[in-house]
Amino acid sequence: MKERTSSTVLLEKQLQTMIEQNMETFFGIRFLKSEYAITSGRMDSIGIDENNSPVIFEYKRSMSENVINQGLFYLDWLLDHKADFKLLVIEKLGMEVADQT
């Protein structure tokens, strides 16, 4: 039996795809990866800004104060895993950009 996808889940995924495909145009952010797996979970979308700093996009169907905690967790993870982020930048944008992170 196939699980039915709700329209809100579909809408969230469509929004994520649209943002990822147009991240640089909309926000000036270079897209790096979708569903970026980390120690305990995943970031919906991750990119890099004009200062070569990471930018995380999370797509939510509803408002929740938990989103702040999630953002703080991601910040803490990035601070503790700078080498992992640098490897992602090397893989997607090359060593020259990664050396500036």
Regions found by a protein language model. Name each.
Residues M1-T101:
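Charged, terminal alpha-helix-loop-beta segments
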